[in-house]
Amino acid sequence: MPAPALTGPQYLREGLKLILSPGLRLFVLLPLSINIVLFCGLIYLAVHQFELWVDTFMPTLPHWLSFLSYILWPLFVALVLLMVFFTFTVVANIIAAPFNGFLSEKVEAVIRGVDESPDFSWAELVAMVPRTLAREARKLGYMLPRMLGLFILSFIPVANIIAAPLWLLFGVWMMAIQYIDYPADNHKLGWNEMLGWLKSKRWQSLSFGGIVYVALLIPVVNLLMMPAAVAAATLFWVRERGADALPIAHARD
């Protein structure tokens, strides 16, 4: 008897439990560690270059402007914090894309009871990189023209009244696409087929996308929510597809 479907919040809660299990933690920690190291390195370089610039620039100013050194540093720190806040999640998604497909595959093995502690394989991960990056490019190709249309709509008098709710609805829909596409891609489901399936499960997809959208808005917490959303989307795939959700080994035959 197939397991019952869940609501969006239930899927995310179960996804969080899955990624915190001992057998899957490594698949979460690795991309997160890479992202943190990358940002720490970039921040270090930015601080070093800014310090050199201040040391070069300040001596050229009149003495009465020396107080600027006490203003420039706080401004720089504020700028760095804003940069991290607005770009960390975006960069994390790009870096994590191959890992997310890999994580989804391992989560599915655990869900199906095939393997409670799947092995990590660099060769398997590297083999997935071209396909997952191509799929990410396909998502951008779907998202950007629609964002442009909404952006233009936002400046049209009267019509712009509906722009805000449409932006929200589109953001929720893109969250469903972003994460449910990982298990769909692992099963070699074509892009249009995947979209068609999500549309056939429109309310379930929007429920899932909505809770993920809200969770990813929370700073720091969103770092854990990204892999949790991958696991939740994989569970969504297995539960909602029912008998059609063949194990990956069969899907690839």
UniProtKB/Swiss-Prot annotation:
Cellular component (GO) terms are:
plasma membrane
Q: Where is the protein situated, by its record's location annotation?
A: Cell inner membrane
Recorded hits in InterPro entries, A to Z, give: CysZ_sulfate_transptr (IPR050480), Sulfate_CysZ (IPR022985)
Which chain regions cross the lipid bilayer?
Answer: 27-47, 71-91, 150-170, 211-231
Note the Pfam families from the entry.
EI24
What superkingdom does the record give? Bacteria
User: Its membrane topology, per UniProt?
Assistant: Multi-pass membrane protein
Instruction: Name the GO terms of the biological process aspect.
Output: cysteine biosynthetic process; sulfate assimilation
What does the UniProt keyword field contain?
A: Amino-acid biosynthesis, Cell inner membrane, Cell membrane, Cysteine biosynthesis, Membrane, Sulfate transport, Transmembrane, Transmembrane helix, Transport
Q: Which GO terms describe its molecular function?
A: high-affinity sulfate:proton symporter activity
Q: Does the keyword Transmembrane helix apply?
A: yes
Q: What does this protein do?
A: High affinity, high specificity proton-dependent sulfate transporter, which mediates sulfate uptake. Provides the sulfur source for the cysteine synthesis pathway.
Which HAMAP family does the entry mention? CysZ (MF_00468)
Q: Which family is this protein grouped under?
A: Belongs to the CysZ family.
Q: What is this protein called?
A: Sulfate transporter CysZ
Q: Which organism is it from?
A: Pseudomonas syringae pv. tomato (strain ATCC BAA-871 / DC3000)
